[in-house]
A protein has these predicted regions:
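Nuclease-adjacent, charged terminal/linker segments that flank catalytic cores
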Residues: 1-74
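Extracellular-facing segments of soluble proteins and assemblies that are Gly/Ser/Thr-biased and enriched
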Residues: 63-101
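Short, well-structured alpha-helical interface segments that form or flank functional binding sites
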Residues: 70, 74, 78, 112, ...
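Active-site metal-binding core of divalent-cation-utilizing nuclease and nuclease-like domains
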Residues: 89-119
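Conserved catalytic cores of phosphodiester-cleaving nucleases, focusing on short active-site segments
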Residues: 117-130
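Catalytic cores of nucleic-acid endonucleases
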Residues: 128-175
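Charged, structured surface patches that assemble and position nucleic-acid processing machinery
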Residues: 171-193
Length: 193
């Protein structure tokens, strides 16, 4: 399965659904707040009513005010669905993070990002990244931190897909080649094997 194509198709569908949602929710507080903040940011050169009408009648304007599918955990949800994995909690006492000693902890301060899934007997982080740049490099650093700290005492995995990871997955594998507690894979690889 080409997971990248699958995710991109799902994101496209989500964008269209999100445009319809922002139009449907035009009178709800979350949309009104976005409109109000936009008017303030542009020093009132347009009115709230101008923007409201634009959202309802212009797909380009609506697309600027709808929810961002990149922030809706689409790839994480699809990865879990495709692989038949249950999402682990991302906060609270049952959350799985690692501290500097490789111990499992639940607090976020000074510790790794939370594990997303259990894949076989590995605590796994899952990332889908489609571009280059600072934010993407931060995601890579989060994965490296998770693998380094988690592998001190546990088996850990990175399930990484998307164009960014097509480039960096081999580099990551090389970096952790001598660590038997680390498994680096992708949804595409897991579904093809």
């Amino acid at each position: 399965m080409d997971f990248t194509a699958y995710v991109e198709n799902a994101k496209k569908k989500a964008r269209l659904a999100n445009i319809e949602e922002v139009r449907k929710d035009i009178d709800k507080s979350w949309v009104k707040e976005k409109i109000h903040n936009h008017v303030l940011a542009f020093d009132g050169i347009m009115t709230e009513e101008d923007i409201r009408e634009g959202i309802l009648n212009n797909i380009i304007i609506a697309s600027k005010f709808c929810k961002d599918p990149g922030k809706q955990n689409i790839s994480e949800n699809l990865a879990g669905e495709v692989l038949g994995l249950t999402k682990l909690v991302s906060s609270g006492k049952r959350c799985v993070r690692f501290n500097d000693a490789g111990d499992i902890v639940s607090t976020s301060t000074g510790n790794t990002k939370s594990a997303d899934f259990i894949l076989k007997d590995y605590y796994a982080t899952q990332k889908y990244t489609d571009g280059e740049g600072g934010a993407q490099d931060n995601q890579r650093n989060d994965v490296i931190d998770f693998l380094k700290r988690g592998s001190i005492k546990h088996k850990v995995a990175a399930i990484v897909d998307g164009p960014y990871w097509d480039k960096y997955r081999p580099i990551l594998r090389e970096e952790f080649a001598s660590n038997p507690n680390v498994w680096i894979t992708s949804v595409t690889e897991l579904t093809e094997n």
